[in-house]
């Protein structure tokens, strides 16, 4: 590449002085007439260290005058010459050419002059010196200053993983300056440079991609600098396994027994569910061990409890409610009146749009759901949800799923512990808490309903379970609802109320929870709030949980920092999707708490969150995007736009092979499977659409793991063991299916898992450290006994899911 630079000095001539002489003789005593010619005299100033080989000149002028000749060159700092015999005239031009001995520079300059009288003229010639190919040109106006030349830049190695360093080395020369006189300035489009004013800096990669490292070398003249660059590649760290891409798909509000309570695994596999435990029979009717899931009503107590002092088993289960499920088809929301209206939904295949037009209850809101067989006289345990008048594609009522409520519903006490159930959680207060904590309809007995996969319910997820690997010991990390559990999926921890700079402060008192019962009621909460300082055992609701944790043999750390209030129930982030900070309403203050997004970004590993409805704004779930709470990913538009995407963007990335290493994806509100507002079959359709998109890109599919799971159990009953890990959970089991070429075979895994297991898998697969010193991903993998693979003997312990894979397939 040719570079043109301007220097302040002149190679040729300082001054070319011309004088008119009265004739050619130097003898002043001779009286003759002038011959009407003159002569031109000049001194050639040569810059230090520059050795000229030749200096040629050409003079052209009036009446066709032309003369070309050479000047004798002496190896000195001044070369003098006189050019005689130039006729009087106006408008002469002299052109000088000089070349250095090493032939590295050829200089050319010209000037005009007149010989029209006896006075002396001075003429300056500005010469342009062209260095040999690729070095540039020089405009000279005095003593020569040749620009430095960058001869080359080497980068070793030319490609490294993010976090590693590349050695850069440049060579530069300047024919009229010593090497020590040159200054170096390096710049980079990404990463950090050590030694950026030396010839040999080191680049440390911080982000994946092509990085340009640029060098400017100067000899001190602001107008004279040489520039050159080199491109290097900072690559993402290679995964430890054949899994190069992970997609985490998160639906809403279904427990394992609610979804797979009747599932029968392939031969050679076992599963823990309602059917295998004899709680129900194969036809869904009460089984011989139905009492294991019997529900009870607690007696009144003065304060909040997580295990009542006394309780009475229901004779008849409180009936299921239609709650807020849609009563009829609607033109602007599911279930739509026709397929044209349903076509506004772009995140499922056209063949599945009909699901958005069916399933209205045909009943008023918040009444007994008589579509359930024998709804008003159900026995006091699990019941089959679907039947002759309740098809699988029907919308059903929601249930309560909040923090203090779920602690009560699971009824945990060390006094109830057994070797198979050392936590002592009986899970026998689900309908009672739904009925008692509030006067509103919160699902009543809907929490005990289950689908029947053996009668055609949940067909696509059953197919995935039959084909790939499923866990029957996966749990929601947080007792309660959507927002806090999505936070666990990213932070591996609860989110604190802070001043925005990481310092804990108290939220407004009106937001604090007080689950103590109101006077004269049986468990009607005083304030169903969203925040608690769980380091304060005297705070409402806190003491009962801390006392239980302290009584457990393994004494789990509550993980409650001093004077810190934690997010327990759904509250929107301070940031809107476009990065604007909310100024009104209730929201979680911006946080700088670290998440898996920080861990990935620190190592240059690509990741995105794909939220259904993110682009169009309708149906998008803010509390389902844990990264939207973080200042580091929301305040800067470029960073936000890099990571926050829509489902349609995921479809494009899959098709183009540009899927990041780690993807979190949550469907819009119509497709997330949430009771009342969605249907489980719609979440199946969403997952099926994504897997079909992957099928169309076999190369990408071959290295991709799709994790199909849920945020929480939604307040539905589950019979599985619950491990108390800290103040915040765990909670009930939820489905987890791993879809990849390395999880085939319909195997059922029993290792104890929760949402943080997904973080642990990502960290192990890419060699990442735990997110923080207090996050749950610090806990070890479970150690179990052969006779009870569900209960870790080293509690608290959470699997990293690696034992669900066979990388030899």
Residue ranges and their predicted role:
Residues 46-48, 172-177, 219:
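Extracellular acidic, Ser/Thr/Pro-rich low-complexity tracts
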Residues 77-93:
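Short Pro-Gly-centered beta-turn/loop motif in secreted/extracellular proteins
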Residues 178-185:
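Solvent-exposed loop segments of extracellular immunoglobulin-like
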Residues 70-74, 99-133:
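Structured interaction patches on ligand/partner-binding surfaces of diverse proteins
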Residues 148-150, 201:
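Proline-centered linker/hinge motifs at extracellular inter-domain junctions
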Residues 235-809:
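N-terminal pro-sequences and low-complexity stem/linker regions of secreted or lumenal proteins
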Residues 17-50, 96, 117-147, 224, ...:
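Bacterial Sec-dependent N-terminal signal peptides
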Residues 185-203:
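Surface-exposed, flexible coil segments in extracellular/virion-facing regions
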């Amino acid at each position: 590449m040719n570079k043109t630079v301007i220097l302040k000095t002149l190679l040729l001539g300082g001054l070319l002085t011309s004088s008119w002489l009265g004739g050619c003789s130097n003898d002043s005593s001779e009286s003759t007439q002038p011959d009407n010619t003159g002569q031109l005299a000049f001194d050639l100033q040569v810059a230090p260290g520059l050795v000229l080989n030749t200096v040629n000149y050409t003079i052209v002028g009036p009446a066709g005058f032309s003369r070309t000749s050479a000047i004798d060159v002496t190896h000195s700092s001044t070369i003098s010459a006189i050019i005689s015999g130039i006729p009087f005239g106006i408008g002469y031009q002299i052109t000088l050419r000089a070349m250095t001995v090493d032939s590295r520079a050829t200089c050319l300059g010209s000037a005009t002059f007149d010989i029209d009288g006896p006075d002396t003229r001075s003429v300056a010639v500005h010469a342009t010196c062209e260095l040999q190919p690729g070095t540039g040109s020089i405009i000279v106006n005095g003593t020569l200053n040749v620009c430095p030349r960058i001869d080359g830049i080497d980068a070793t190695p030319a490609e490294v993983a993010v976090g590693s360093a590349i050695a850069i080395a440049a060579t530069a020369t300047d024919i009229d300056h010593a090497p020590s006189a040159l200054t170096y300035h390096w710049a980079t489009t990404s990463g950090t440079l050590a030694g950026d004013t030396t010839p040999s800096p080191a680049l440390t990669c911080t982000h994946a991609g092509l990085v340009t490292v640029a060098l400017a070398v100067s000899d001190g003249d602001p107008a004279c600098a040489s520039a050159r660059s080199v491109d290097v590649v900072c690559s993402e760290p290679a995964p430890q396994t054949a899994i190069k891409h992970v997609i985490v798909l998160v639906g809403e509000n279904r427990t394992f027994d609610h979804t797979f309570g009747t599932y029968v695994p392939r031969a050679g596999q076992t599963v823990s569910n309602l059917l295998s435990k004899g709680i129900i029979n194969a036809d869904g009717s009460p089984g011989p061990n139905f009492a294991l899931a019997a529900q009870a009503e607690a007696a009144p107590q003065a304060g909040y409890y997580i295990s009542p002092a006394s309780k009475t088993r229901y004779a008849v289960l409180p009936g299921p409610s239609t709650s807020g499920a849609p009563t009829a088809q609607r033109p602007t929301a599911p279930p739509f009146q026709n397929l044209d209206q349903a076509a506004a939904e772009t995140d499922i295949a056209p063949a599945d749009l009909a699901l958005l037009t069916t399933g209205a209850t045909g009943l008023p809101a918040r009444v007994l759901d008589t579509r359930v067989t024998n709804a008003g006289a159900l026995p006091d345990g699990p019941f089959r949800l679907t039947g002759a008048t309740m098809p699988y594609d029907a919308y059903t009522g929601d249930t309560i799923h909040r923090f203090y409520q779920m602690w009560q519903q699971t009824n945990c006490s060390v006094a109830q512990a057994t070797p198979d159930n050392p936590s002592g959680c009986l899970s026998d207060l689900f309908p009672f808490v739904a009925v008692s904590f509030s006067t509103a309809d919160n699902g009543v007995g809907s929490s005990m309903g289950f689908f029947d996969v053996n009668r055609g319910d949940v067909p696509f997820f059953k197919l995935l379970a039959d084909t790939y690997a499923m866990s029957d010991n996966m749990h929601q990390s947080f007792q309660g609802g959507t927002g806090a559990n999505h936070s666990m999926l990213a932070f591996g921890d609860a989110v604190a109320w802070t001043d925005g700079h990481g310092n804990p402060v108290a939220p407004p008192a009106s937001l604090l929870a007080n689950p103590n019962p109101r006077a004269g009621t049986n468990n009607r909460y005083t304030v169903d709030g969203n925040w608690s300082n769980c380091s304060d055992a005297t705070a409402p609701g806190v003491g009962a949980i801390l006392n239980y944790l302290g009584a457990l043999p393994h004494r789990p750390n509550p993980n409650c920092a001093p004077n810190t209030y934690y997010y327990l129930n759904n509250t929107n982030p301070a940031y809107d999707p476009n990065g604007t900070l909310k100024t009104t309403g209730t929201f979680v203050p911006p946080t700088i708490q670290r998440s898996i997004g920080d861990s990935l970004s620190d190592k240059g590993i690509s990741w995105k969150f794909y939220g259904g409805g993110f682009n169009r704004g309708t149906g998008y779930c803010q509390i389902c995007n844990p990264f939207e709470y973080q200042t580091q990913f929301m305040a800067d538009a470029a960073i936000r736009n890099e990571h926050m995407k829509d489902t349609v963007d995921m479809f494009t990335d899959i098709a183009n092979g540009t899927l990041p290493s780690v993807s979190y994806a949550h469907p819009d509100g119509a497709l997330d499977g949430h009771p009342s507002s969605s249907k489980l079959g719609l979440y199946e359709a969403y997952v099926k659409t994504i897997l079909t998109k992957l099928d169309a890109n076999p190369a990408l599919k071959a290295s991709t793991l799709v994790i199909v799971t849920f945020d929480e159990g939604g307040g539905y009953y589950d019979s599985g063991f619950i491990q108390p890990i800290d103040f915040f959970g765990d909670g009930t089991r939820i489905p987890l299916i791993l879809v990849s070429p390395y999880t085939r075979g319909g195997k059922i895994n029993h290792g104890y898992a929760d949402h943080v297991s997904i973080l642990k898998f990502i960290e192990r697969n890419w060699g990442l450290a735990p997110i923080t010193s207090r996050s749950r991903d610090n806990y070890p993998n479970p150690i179990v006994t052969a006779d009870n693979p569900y209960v870790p003997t080293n509690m608290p312990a959470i699997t990293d899911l690696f034992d669900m894979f066979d990388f030899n397939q």
